Amino acid sequence: SERYWLDRPSGLPGNSAVPLVSVDGAMNHAFDGAMKPTEALMKSHYIHQAIASFGEVVARSRLMRLAPGAQVAEHVDFNYHWVSRVRIHIPIITNPQVNFYCGDESVHMAQGESWLFDSWRRHRVVNASDSARTHLVIDLAGSSRFWRIVRKADSLDNIVILPNDHSQPRVKTEQFPVAPVMAPGEMLAIVEQVLEDCESNPDNDSEMMLRYRHLLLDLVHDWREVWGLYGFNDGAFDRYRHILDRTARQLAPQPRVLVTASNNVGI
């Protein structure tokens, strides 16, 4: 039903989506909260079956529609949601004039195929046709079984999931997508990854690079100190917020004072 289709949060013209797995199973695009199947998914047995066939714990998942002649502008997915999750695209309605661009590669995702891509690379989508394109889009982190399949994908036979009205699919959904406070080890890993990416860009100023390295590692060290004393206790949140605010005040005002080498994102 058309009543399930929502405009995308980005406000891009011609982009709409039906939430299938969402926070509390409601009609939203949120990330932070227990994920549940929506009414739309419960009424779509075959789609329910397709998502369940992966056997994975899934995060936010949607039907995503791109109107005739519309496009998704080039961008990078750098929300915290994407630190540990990837996106699966399964084209439901498409045609050869719909193309996906990721980095320096382009591909037409054919109907019924299953595609996985690196959303940290710059990517965009163009629907140059006169008909709408609809994909089933599933976000997940993936178990070791899932990643073994990904590693062997080029040598595996295709698996066809046919509609089965007698099946009782169960979609496992994330219940704890975000910790109340980021663990210091996770923060350090993210900081080191960003710093390494920026240090790989020869155009970045070396003095500014050193300044940001010290600033961000100071953030991690002080975060770890508060974590060791208070953990998740309610009284700790003001202390964590103080560290974040202090760090933010020391950032340079320019939005691109440092730029990543991998995808040209400004820090």
Predicted regions and their residues:
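A short beta-strand-loop-beta hairpin characteristic of the jelly-roll/cupin
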Residues: 91-111
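Charged, low-complexity interaction regions
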Residues: 181, 199-208, 225-234
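A short hydrophobic beta-strand segment most commonly corresponding to one strand
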Residues: 86-91, 116, 130-148
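Extracellular structured ligand-interaction cores
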Residues: 58-61, 85-89, 97, 122, ...
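Non-heme Fe(II)/2-oxoglutarate
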Residues: 1-53, 160-166, 213-267
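Short beta-strand His + acidic residue motifs that chelate non-heme Fe in jelly-roll/DSBH
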Residues: 73-75, 98-100, 117-118, 122-129
